UniProtKB/Swiss-Prot annotation:
Protein name (Swiss-Prot/TrEMBL): UPF0391 membrane protein Rru_A0119
Membrane topology: Multi-pass membrane protein
Compartments (UniProt record): Cell membrane
Organism: Rhodospirillum rubrum (strain ATCC 11170 / ATH 1.1.1 / DSM 467 / LMG 4362 / NCIMB 8255 / S1)
Residue ranges crossing the lipid bilayer per the database entry: 4-24, 30-50
Family membership noted in the UniProt record: Belongs to the UPF0391 family.
An example Gene Ontology CC term for this record: plasma membrane
HAMAP family, per database record: UPF0391 (MF_01361)
InterPro entries (UniProt xref): DUF1328
Assigned keywords, A-Z: Cell membrane, Membrane, Transmembrane, Transmembrane helix
Top-level division of the source organism's lineage: Bacteria
Main location: membrane
């Protein structure tokens, strides 16, 4: 349990450094682009799944 607490502490410190350092704005715009890319890939994957014929 202590290991997880230390891991989350390190992650929080790194996130704070990014947030207070001004890198968060650039990272947020990249994250938005990646979100929409993966959303499109999800929709394509679902369409392919439901239109695929069963090969039994």
């Amino acid at each position: 349990m202590l290991t997880w607490a230390l891991i989350f502490l390190v992650v929080a410190v790194v996130a704070a450094l990014f947030g207070f350092g001004g890198i968060a704005g650039a990272a947020a715009s990249i994250a938005q682009i990646l979100f929409f890319v993966f959303l499109v890939l999800l929709v394509i994957s679902l369409i392919m799944h439901f239109t695929r014929r069963s090969r039994l």
